[in-house]
């Protein structure tokens, strides 16, 4: 298939992109926007007022950014995660109402400019935005930031094959087409938000509520990773796998695309401690560092933080641990200032892609969010799986038992706490054992397959070409 390039077009096509306002959802869609922008499309990223306050730029290397109100009181804008944890159902209700009203106004404003928007790519967790797009005469593209395997489970939840709440799944075992046999603990979990679990589960299942009306269905995955499930879903809807949507510069691919992302300024919309952590990693030998991060939303208990910190110290390995500022008070007393400095570095955030690509990183202790999973896979880094909620539990199952690129911890007490002994054992399995060598070989294999998918002629490359062509000639 020939390369689609509309840079020389006198009137570029205008694409709107609206990710759910969380880092793990914004970044993958932003990276897809980068690829589309490199083909000459005009891109406008829509985000919320509170998100815009936390980003480092209002224009990302040629991608315009527009903000809309969150729908929550202004004084709580900086505490969006806390608001979600307290009453997720109320948050989503307010956000939905605000997003529908203000996205409509924004599209109407942008339609008066040249070029007017033609398509709205939106996060699949916001299916109600499709109606806004169609009412305003735009095409709608649903972008799934989770694997097809997890999406298939949510679809079966919507169909009633899996009953809500998930805790009532019969015998705790689920058998679904083209998926491994799943225990109850492998199903997408929402236990972290106990008071909101049913509301969240329904929200996730609703991703498929109007999928038959969507003009495009885009998945941040690649064919080789989940070929049977991709084919099954493709028999129902015209899906396009376009992942991994990590920056193509990390694969050292197309020069034009790499130049477009030169300096990596486009890779991160949010501020990162690049200099501090990269200098620290440069001082470590190859495969000696455990990178630890549990994402932008997951919240560990104080007891769990204690178990993780003790396991890291007892492993006698170097470690780089990302702990969000609002979570720091859960660390053991003086851990960041004294104990950890002997072997580790604790920071609030970091350039995760650069960290995972660094030669000193031996493994990744992760919550198994899909964004982090793909970034580790693309970097050829084995994982220690410590899932918290939502799709992470299923991702962990796939990482350990299907793709065989990681080991999973056991929640060994009644409170779901992972003990330090179990974490230590996982660290030693990945870093010191023969199994660890096998995990590394598998990780490198999947890294190469991911590179093939986004390279010219690969499945995801061709699907992005197909999407681009459709917009050009539709």
Curated annotation (Swiss-Prot):
Gene3D superfamilies: Glycogen Phosphorylase B. Signal peptide: none annotated. Keywords: Glycosyltransferase, Transferase. It comes from the Eukaryota. One of its GO terms (molecular function) is quercetin 7-O-glucosyltransferase activity. Its EC number is 2.4.1.-. UDP-alpha-D-glucose binds at residues 296, 349-350, 367-375, 389-392. It holds the Pfam family UDPGT. Belongs to the UDP-glycosyltransferase family. This is UDP glycosyltransferase 9. It comes from Catharanthus roseus (Madagascar periwinkle).
